[in-house]
Swiss-Prot record:
Protein name: ATP-dependent Clp protease ATP-binding subunit ClpX
Binding site for Zn(2+): 13, 16, 35, 38
Annotated function: ATP-dependent specificity component of the Clp protease. It directs the protease to specific substrates. Can perform chaperone functions in the absence of ClpP.
Similarity-based family: Belongs to the ClpX chaperone family.
Subunit note: Component of the ClpX-ClpP complex. Forms a hexameric ring that, in the presence of ATP, binds to fourteen ClpP subunits assembled into a disk-like structure with a central cavity, resembling the structure of eukaryotic proteasomes.
Length: 417
C-alpha cells in the first residue's frame, strides 16, 4: 500500500508510533499498520538469530535422522544407495558425538572420518558438498595432489584449515564443526611397499602431516591467509570436531583385492569354474585396511579413516537419470534457461541416451555430461535470444552424434495474434 491515504486521518505505525508522514512506506494489515523502518529492523533481528544458530552448529535435536539425510542426498545424487546410507549414519553419529562431549560419560567416542572409494565422476565430491548443505556447516575442499610437507614447495596441509576458516567467514567456532573434503587422496600413497630412503614429500610425508589435523590438533592459521612469519598472530583452530571426508579413484586397488581373495576379473583365460567373476568396481566393496596398506597408506593414516564407503561406476541408465532427475539435473537447468527466453526445450529419449554413451566413452563419469551438452547446445543458445516467434526447440540424437541442427518449432501467425 502507498504511504499516503486520501482520507484526512493521519495513520501511524502500530509498532513504533511514527506517522505516515515520517516514514517512506506504511503497509496495512487487517487491523494494524507497519512502517518500512520496523520491517527492516525485524529483518535484521531474524538475520542475527540465523547467524547465531549457524555459529552454534547443527543441534542434535534438529539434526536430520540418517533416513532424512539419505532422502535429501537422493535428490542430488543418483544411485550409490549403500554409500549414501554409510555417509548418512557416519555424519549423524559424528554430530551426536560432538553434542555428547559436554556431558559426563564413561565411554569415549572416537571421530568417524570417512574414506570414499570410487571412479572419477561417480559422485564423491557432490555427496560431500550436499552433506555440508544439509547440515548447514562450513565446507572446504582440497586436492591432495597439491599438498606437500611443510617446508617444501607446494601447499601446506594447514592451508586446508585456512580454506575452511574462510568458508566460515573467520568464525572459529563454526569452522571447528565444519566438513573438509580431500580429493585425490589415493595420489599420496607411498610409491612402494617398503619405506623410502629418500624423502617422499608428496606421498608418505603428506600422510604424516595430514595425520595430525585429521585425528585432532590445534592448528595455527594466519588470520587472513598468506605466508607465516614470526611476528604474525595466528588463529587457533581445534580440528578435533572437524569431519574429514577423503575420496579417490584408487586405480590398481582392485588388483590387490583380487590377489587376496583369489578372484579373477573378466577376461580371456579366466577360470570360470573355480573363480567368481567380478568387475573392478565390484571388487572395491571387498576392500580391507590390509589392502589399503599394500596400496601405499601408512597404518596410522588408515586408522584415522575408519568408515569406508564404495561408489560404483555409473552405467548408461544411471547417466540418463543424472541428466534428468536430480534437482540440479542438466536438462532442467537448460530448460530453465530456455524458459527465460519464452521457449520450450525438449530432449528426446534418444538424445539423452546418446549423451550418456558419449560420456561413458570419455571415462570421466557424470563429469563429462556437461561438456558434451555445452558443445551440442552452443549454436542454438547463441541464436535463440536474437530470434522471435520461436515456440519450441527439440534436441534429437542426431544433434549429439552428427552435430545436426536442433528442430525449431515456430509460433503460427494465429498464435502470435
Amino acid at each position: 500500500m502507498s504511504r499516503r491515504n486520501d482520507s484526512s486521518e493521519n495513520l501511524t505505525c502500530s509498532f513504533c508510533g511514527k506517522s505516515q508522514d515520517e516514514v517512506k512506506k506504511l503497509i496495512a494489515g487487517p487491523t494494524v499498520y507497519i512502517c518500512d523502518e520496523c520491517i527492516e529492523l525485524c529483518n535484521d533481528i531474524i538475520a542475527e538469530e540465523s547467524k547465531l544458530e549457524e555459529a552454534m552448529g547443527p543441534d542434535v535435536k534438529k539434526l536430520p535422522k540418517p533416513r532424512e539425510i539419505k532422502d535429501v542426498l537422493d535428490e542430488y545424487v543418483i544411485g550409490q544407495d549403500r554409500a549414501k546410507k554409510i555417509l548418512a549414519v557416519a555424519v549423524y553419529n559424528h554430530y551426536k558425538r560432538i553434542e555428547s562431549m559436554g556431558k559426563p560419560s564413561d565411554v569415549e567416542m572416537q571421530k568417524s572420518n570417512i574414506l570414499l572409494l570410487g571412479p572419477t565422476g561417480s559422485g564423491k565430491t557432490l555427496l560431500a558438498q550436499t552433506l555440508a548443505r544439509i547440515l548447514r556447516v562450513p565446507f572446504a575442499m582440497a586436492d591432495a595432489t597439491n599438498l606437500t610437507e611443510a617446508g617444501y614447495v607446494g601447499e601446506d596441509v594447514e592451508n586446508i584449515i585456512l580454506n575452511l576458516l574462510q568458508a566460515a567467514d573467520y568464525d572459529v567456532e563454526r569452522a571447528q564443526k565444519g566438513i573438509i573434503y580431500i580429493d585425490e587422496i589415493d595420489k599420496i600413497a607411498r610409491k612402494s611397499d617398503s619405506p623410502s630412503i629418500t624423502r617422499d614429500v608428496s606421498g608418505e610425508g603428506v600422510q604424516q602431516a595430514l595425520l595430525k589435523i585429521i585425528e585432532g590438533t590445534v592448528a595455527s592459521v594466519p588470520p587472513k591467509g598468506g605466508r607465516k612469519h614470526p611476528q604474525q598472530e595466528f588463529l587457533k583452530v581445534d580440528t578435533s570436531n572437524i569431519l574429514f571426508i577423503c575420496g579417490g579413484a584408487f586405480a590398481g586397488l582392485d588388483n590387490i583385492i583380487q590377489q587376496r581373495i583369489g578372484v579373477k576379473t573378466l577376461g580371456f583365460g579366466a577360470d570360470v569354474k573355480s573363480k567368481v567373476e567380478k568387475k573392478a568396481g565390484e571388487l572395491l566393496t571387498d576392500v580391507t585396511p590390509e589392502d589399503l596398506l599394500k596400496f601405499g597408506f601408512i597404518p596410522e593414516f588408515i586408522g584415522r579413516l575408519p568408515v569406508l564407503a564404495t561408489l560404483h561406476e555409473l552405467d548408461e541408465a544411471a547417466m540418463v537419470q543424472i541428466l534428468k532427475e536430480p534437482k540440479s539435473a542438466l536438462v532442467k537447468q537448460y530448460q530453465k534457461l530456455f524458459e527465460m527466453e519464452h521457449v520450450k526445450l525438449k530432449f528426446t529419449d534418444g538424445s539423452l541416451v546418446a549423451i550418456a554413451r558419449e560420456a561413458l566413452k570419455r571415462k570421466t563419469g557424470a563429469r563429462g555430461l556437461r561438456s558434451i551438452l555445452e558443445n551440442a547446445m552452443l549454436d542454438i543458445m547463441y541464436e535463440i535470444p536474437s530470434q522471435t516467434m520461436v515456440k519450441e526447440v527439440v534436441i534429437s540424437e542426431d544433434v549429439i552424434y552428427n552435430r545436426e541442427k536442433p528442430i525449431i518449432v515456430y509460433e503460427s501467425v494465429a498464435e502470435s495474434a
